[in-house]
């Protein structure tokens, strides 16, 4: 905003103007001499006299720079107004032949800015308008009130009753005031009326007309003290020529611009040339629009509200459940939202991969299940008719069949095959299959049952001599001769294409002898692509070679197969060293798939493929990951998972529940030991003891304290062993020793410790190996209470739910071992050595009594008698009859049958130490705080309530926090161990 000049400034400005009017106007008179530069100036003297020009001369020639209008307003404004060029501060008199330099510079600045503004704004693009209509673009209303007041202050005051047009600031058009100016110095305003039609209209570039919006108008205000000069300015003269209709159109355009600008937020273009380089893409697009269409201001991206875009592929919204789908903007791919957990991603591939984690896809027409949606669609296309698909609401495009597809190689009733193989061998089953089919056909003739799908059966060109022997020594009820007779009498049982039985049998014979005329070998040198478009890579199973085509893979396979063992296909470059592989390959050539699923229309070339397919009709996941809840029906899928995530497989001896076919777990059993594993416990060998040190690799435990650690090591399977002497040697019971986790309760800490055990790399596969892997810490500061601290512990293991206890672990080891270093086998060492008999382990009752803190109820003599009885019974055991005598013992103090080299394991030591503290707490817990679903007791009601909130009402094995569906209490417990829920 330009400040109004004071009277003193006007008087000062008028004085040099009056003086300059007496001077010549030529510029050469002002600058008559060349200026002095550098060393040309004299060192002393008056610099005025030394200079060639006077200060007044330089002032006369100096042209002040134009004032740059401010385009950007305050930052908080929702829109920016454009300030136009300034008007001259002095009144121009008709008799004045000279204009001051400052005034001339101001007019030149006004000329430049006025042209830029008028050229950059043109909301109406109608090129067919008349000249009078184009006058709307001439703006005479851009001056502010201050500029008007400055221009109007003069000794001559215009009467207020004189009709003057009302000016509006910020109109859509700008004047071309300089078009009627002659020169900047000789311009004079005459009293003659201005003829507007004769004024030249500047040519405005087309791209400026259509690209930039008009400036935002400001509501006009009327000043009470408006002074007008006697002679109207050029803008006023132009304004007088506008009609009332043109004024209405100008106001209408201003209203449109005001409305659009009020709806936008942010920066807007002011319409000047300073913004011509903003977003050239949108300018080019807008210039290509129709001239009759109005270019709205809202198309400028700077005016619109900035939208937050993310570069991440996935985003999980806060909370659970489905999330509203965000609207599509600028043609972007819409986000795919999981209806179960709210997972979102724009990729269909990743969305399908995520949906596979929620369960199987089941066919609505049969009991087929699949982990992927693509396999399910393929099954529905190939295994069900079109009517069934339409009835089930499944609509999809027909599957694209490749040139080598068996369907393309088979003949139809109304056409013949074009391949030479199909012209000669229209075969789809083996001879064994044709005999089976004819047997069914003969039996169906007697029962007047229409044979189903027998007309499509044909012979197999890849038959081997074993098939002919099957034909000769058939075990079917009907003889082979009767079956062949039935085929010859009923043409519907014959192969299609006009091949009779004799020619078919001849073809099989020629195929067996190798005399089959082989056409030109098919080429498989092209690169294959997967369904996702990626090039398929064929990897060699014997080395790291990779090929991009089948021919390259087969050519490389010849380097691994000896020449005398290579079996080559006659129709392509396939090579193998196994006959059954060649037979399967031939079946693929001719479409022979005799193995068919009884539950769907799937058929394949061998039995193993059918067995693998039958898993899709079951819900039993026998292959499981130990480190996560991943389970699959196929071993190959599990191997890929383990390789990808570096996880471990659940040992075969441990059967973890999952699926409908798995046996249900009882209240307190989570891991079942198979008979194979029990046999492993019995048959585990024991090395002879050569050391006379302690019987166990760890320090002896106190005999009158109990440790309930197996309740957590084996998930509610505990060993009643006294280890309460460890109470004073452990760290804080609520902090994990393996990590920085701090539990809020004892149960939470134990569950956290179990997650470390389950995720450890060395998982024991038997009770004995588990027992041996537990290296207890050394507690030398604990004083023994009695002299029996060196005795062994009772390691009875409760496995079954009916509380049937296995035999003592020492005795079971002795029964299956080949050595004789055991309490029962020690009698074979020396029958006359009494000291050797005394070194045998005590009986089960003695160990249990000492573990409970009681003295032995038997005397030493009775103990010796029991030892003698066990020694007498030892030769009757099967293991003792086949055992090998062990080397002589060097000490009589050896008690333990399982000596192991100490392997320090600080983590397991800390777990056992923590479990010793929790033993009495877990044993004395009140039964009121008990989870009926997980069969786990808790200390307090608060802990139980915190646990129960994860059970979904109506579906207790579904996690209410992440919607994970568990199979039973074990899988739910594993999920709670692995998931970090708050």
Swiss-Prot record:
Pfam hit, one: zf-C2H2
One GO CC term on file: nucleus
Basic and acidic residues composition bias: residue spans: 101-110, 153-175, 863-875
Chief place where the protein resides: nucleus
Tissue-specific expression: Expressed primarily in ectodermal cells during embryonic and larval development.
Keyword Nucleus annotated: yes
Compositionally skewed regions (Polar residues) per UniProt: 111-132, 176-193, 816-831, 843-862
Biased composition (Acidic residues): 142-152
Region (Disordered): 87-194, 377-415, 811-896
Domain of life according to the entry: Eukaryota
Gene3D superfamilies: Classic Zinc Finger
Summary of the knockout phenotype: RNAi-mediated knockdown results in premature alae formation at the L3 larval stage. This phenotype is partially suppressed in a sea-2 bp283 mutant background.
BP GO annotations: egg-laying behavior; embryo development ending in birth or egg hatching; negative regulation of transcription by RNA polymerase II; nematode larval development; protein metabolic process; regulation of development, heterochronic; regulation of transcription by RNA polymerase II
GO molecular function list: DNA-binding transcription factor activity, RNA polymerase II-specific; RNA polymerase II transcription regulatory region sequence-specific DNA binding; zinc ion binding
Zn finger limits (C2H2-type): 336-358, 361-384, 538-560, 567-589, 595-617, 623-647, 734-756, 929-951, 957-981
Keywords: Developmental protein, DNA-binding, Metal-binding, Nucleus, Repeat, Zinc, Zinc-finger
Subcellular localization(s) per the UniProt record: Nucleus
Its biological purpose: Required for the late stages of development. Plays a role in the developmental timing of postembryonic hypodermal seam cell fusion events and adult alae production.
Family, per entry: Belongs to the hunchback C2H2-type zinc-finger protein family.
Protein name: Hunchback-like protein
